[in-house]
Amino acid sequence: MKKLSLVISVYNEEAVLEKFYNAFCNIEQDLKYGGENELIFVNDGSTDASMNILEVIAQQNKNVRVISFSRNFGHEAAMIAGIDHAAGDVIICMDADLQHPLECIAPIMAKFEEGYEVISMVRTSNKSAGAIKNFTSRAFYRVINALSDQVKLEENASDFFAISSRVADVLRTNYREKTRFLRGYVQSVGFRKTTLEYTAAERAGGASHYTLKKLMNFAISTIVGFSDFPLKLGLYTGAVSFLAAVLFAISALCGFREYKVILAAFNVLFAVLFLLVGIMGEYFSVAFAELKNRPIYIVEKEINSGRCV
């Protein structure tokens, strides 16, 4: 049996941590993993009692490791930190709210025994999400796949995935961008991969920390990170604008004097111009973040520490 590292991102999850740990202990006994596994909880700057609960759990079980950030660095940074510190042959990333079913661990491990190195978990349905969220999620993946020539994402793939230690080494070494889309990296890294389906359960407690603003910023950064198509819009828009200018010039020479139409057309072109400037600004901000080369995360405290990169 391969050694398992389970990476769990934690941000203000005091309502679910004990439930998650107890549920895993039950699954662990059923699967007979024994000590051949580790739970890595990454505390992403929680402001509630999450860290206190994790300290108690870690004292009870030496296979529970806790990595605590100096502040909130974000969900993606937490998962990257967990992968950086994981020592298992198989690394599974999942959330603490039990929406990612622990019962999926057994079929995931079975796939690794078959020789797969990347397992993407695909939601068939989400019991806690409304129709609008499900629609926007599908639209997000379709837009990314339409714009990107670098990666084709599995629709409804989530931050619930599993990778081999070899894939983890590639991520540790080569995928250190400051603007991250980890599930995109996992699906674009190559190696032998497959998918498994699951139904997202209701949250075991607490509330989702993803606001509309965070989701919008996440979508924009993902498009910038995986597609250069928005930059090419400038070329396409310039070509269309040039043709429009030629047509207006010909119309003026032929006696066309509808200046309101011309002014309206110029207003549209200026609006598009400012949009393109904004798009370029997003790309420049990403490049600037890379030039500053600040750390993806800062660890303030570790409990039961093992591997550290």
Predicted regions and their residues:
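Hydrophobic helical membrane-anchoring modules
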Residues: R183-V309
